[in-house]
Amino acid sequence: MVKLSCVIVGVPGDPFQVEIDEICELVAGLKDAIKKEKPDSIKCDADKLQLFKAAKEDRTFSASGAEEEKKDFRWLKAASDDVKKLKHGEKTAAIEAVVRKDQVLRGKETVSDVLMGMESPSISQIHVLVVLPEDSESEGGTSAQPAEKERLLKFLREQAADKKRKRYWHSEMDMDQGWELLDDFDLTVKPVSTVHAEADPADSFNWQSDLVQDGQEVVLTEEQQRGRYREYVERNIGAVLKENKLCVTAVDEGENVLSVDVPKLGIELRGRTDLLVLSDIVEETSDYLMHLPEVKMLIEVKRDAEASDFQALSELIALDILAEDPVMALLTDLNQSWKFFWVSKKSDDSDCICKATIKSPGEAFQVIRALLTASAETKLPCFHQPLKRLKLSQHRGYKNAECLQQYYKVAEVSGPDYELARAVAEHLVRSMPGYCCANESEP
């Protein structure tokens, strides 16, 4: 009699042992023994199991380092990384190489054939890999569902662990972080030239100053003048706003409406912008702001806008993920610097962010007015070619609908799972912008 250690591929769980007669037992009998040992994990008929010899190729080398023609096979070590991943339902490249279809053990082979040329089996080794049939789910369900559950739980736990994520605050985005963020999203910035266009004249915004007691003039901060510059922007595009039922809303400190998770990249974007152009329904109640209804663009206002490009890029990426339609970002000093950013594509069809600079307030407002009434692809003032705004096509987060779909898939076979249901619910709540706004404050 011999004891063989087995692992079911794709199903989380520890190795288990079966005892068989190595001399006369057929592989078909080994299948029966495996099913008998794991009745809760294996619901299909035993003859539908695929068994593989858990042996890795071990090439030998001469003293000179040259590879010799002789190739040995050795059992997988129970303590190896490959087997550790197997215990969690994962497959490595080495395991994929073992479970190739041309290496499946035939039912009429004997166990002695399997052991031929191998070292004597021991408890520190893995000897047989078990693969369940692909259609086993339709036959009453198998532990492929627990495997799906474990994968989903692992994903959800990683999202809940802040230490495993990279967090960016828009307001702290310097050059180093900015380039790192673009690299994370595999994005490049493409400058776009502009031309002079006839436009209604518009005055520059007058940044106010205060006189302190010693007579020194001090310019008030952007924060202190947000109400004034919001009215300035609204005044210059008011007719278009009214016609399209839009408004310009100032985002107060602490309202981190541009907070979003990007689970696929392990990234969190946090913070807000200064102004948003969106549906005027938000004027009915401030609660609607977190939902960003029909948002068209964000406006980041800086007294000196020359060194804040990466903050605007970060805010654009966050708004793109949160919004249903293509959006635009504007970084401006409300005087001679009006930088527009939007998502587009390069010639190789990869995502990029386009950047165009306009130096006249009149021309800038002409572009904004046209933008708010145009489709995603249209001819705008000051641009040579029609401007095509798109959505980021990659790196989207794990969608909430996918989490629910996977949960229902598991529950359909194994019944309600309260641990998984709680994890999915917490993930859904964490992904809500309102949750971020209520539970986080900008550093």
Curated annotation (Swiss-Prot):
Its main location: secreted. Residues 18-56 are annotated as: LQLFLAK domain. GO terms for cellular component: extracellular region; host cell nucleus. A motif (Nuclear localization signal 1) lies at residues 161-170. Belongs to the Crinkler effector family. It comes from the Eukaryota. InterPro entries: Crinkler_N (IPR045379). The gene is CRN161. A motif (Nuclear localization signal 2) lies at residues 384-393. A motif (HVLVXXP motif) lies at residues 127-133. This is Crinkler effector protein 161. Keywords: Host nucleus, Secreted, Signal.
